Amino acid sequence: TQPWHVVDGCIQAKGDGSDASGYIVTDKQYENFELSWDWKLSKGGNSGMLYHVVERPQFAVPYVTGPEYQLIDEPNFPEPLEEWQKLGVDYAMHLPDKSKMKVNPQGEWNNSKIVFDNGHVEHWLNGQKILEFEAWTDDWYEKKNSGKWANAPEYGLAKKGVLCLQDHGYPASFRNIKIKELPRKSKEVNLFNGVDLKGWEAYGTELWYVKD
């Protein structure tokens, strides 16, 4: 799309985007994965990597469905930031461990990684795990329903969707974007209900019954 171009092996956001426009998405949808990428922001820059984004006409912008790994130049950002808006957060949901964050200066490359493994989520920054949480738990829903996403009923519910980079009005560069898809884990099923032999069929002449 117009705000994006390729220069010297990097995807670059020109900085022409806004909250309502300026996104680029993958053709393919992903479910469980390890996603890593290098990124570099302009001074005071703001961007993000979103996943499980649902593309439907009723969703005007990607972030009303897709969680976001926030990318931002905190020291030079022109406005005060809430904790849930800062670098490495699961935007407006979960906060990273600041003691584990080692950020290269603005204008230099940093590396980030998202792991989404059957609802277990990790955020990494420059080789350090800075955040992990479980999606769709009671705590997750409490955060969703009491904060920024209270009026975004479909936020974070999709288990599969496209990846999305954000041009939020600041030039940004991305390279070495790599993904490894992870297997879907089968849900454990209880084969005996403890009450009767439903789901079982007698084989042979023996009599089977339920006791205790």
Please give the residue ranges for each predicted region:
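Carbohydrate-interacting regions of secretory-pathway proteins
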Residues: 1-212
